[in-house]
């Protein structure tokens, strides 16, 4: 600008914010197979469960509170319905002291 007043020829209009293409053409480097598998594997989701079973010695009601995955709770259920019996503290002491 030359002089005291600006003329149209002296004013240069430019966009202040330049648009950037967000869909750039960059490529990510290839990850080794071991890293790809570890990235794909997610942390298993743990769900809280309340389990009510009866003592294997005196049939007292026992309550268990656990966190388990879906497959873990199914395996635990299979064990409880099969060869595993839980004991209350009283029966545990009796067996421990040789009374049973």
Curated annotation (Swiss-Prot):
Keyword Amino-acid biosynthesis listed: no
Residue positions of motif Nuclear export signal: 73-81
Matches recorded under SUPFAM superfamilies: E7 C-terminal domain-like
unnamed ZnF: 55-91
Ribonucleoprotein in keyword set: no
Location of this chain's protein in the cell: Host cytoplasm; Host nucleus
Function field: Plays a role in viral genome replication by driving entry of quiescent cells into the cell cycle. Stimulation of progression from G1 to S phase allows the virus to efficiently use the cellular DNA replicating machinery to achieve viral genome replication. E7 protein has both transforming and trans-activating activities. Induces the disassembly of the E2F1 transcription factor from RB1, with subsequent transcriptional activation of E2F1-regulated S-phase genes. Interferes with host histone deacetylation mediated by HDAC1 and HDAC2, leading to transcription activation.
Domain observations: The E7 terminal domain is an intrinsically disordered domain, whose flexibility and conformational transitions confer target adaptability to the oncoprotein. It allows adaptation to a variety of protein targets and exposes the PEST degradation sequence that regulates its turnover in the cell.
Assembly and interaction partners: Homodimer. Homooligomer. Interacts with host RB1; this interaction induces dissociation of RB1-E2F1 complex thereby disrupting RB1 activity. Interacts with host EP300; this interaction represses EP300 transcriptional activity. Interacts with protein E2; this interaction inhibits E7 oncogenic activity. Interacts with host TMEM173/STING; this interaction impairs the ability of TMEM173/STING to sense cytosolic DNA and promote the production of type I interferon (IFN-alpha and IFN-beta).
Entry protein name: Protein E7
């Amino acid at each position: 600008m030359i002089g005291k007043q600006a003329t149209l020829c002296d004013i240069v209009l430019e966009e202040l914010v330049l648009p950037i293409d967000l869909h750039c053409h960059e490529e990510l480097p290839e990850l080794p197979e071991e890293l790809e598998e570890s990235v794909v594997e997610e942390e298993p989701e743990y769900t809280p469960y309340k389990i009510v079973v009866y003592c294997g010695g005196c049939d007292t009601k026992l309550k268990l509170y656990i966190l388990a995955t879906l497959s873990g709770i199914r395996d635990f259920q299979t064990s409880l319905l099969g060869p595993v019996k839980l004991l209350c503290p009283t029966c545990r002491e009796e067996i421990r002291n040789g009374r049973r």
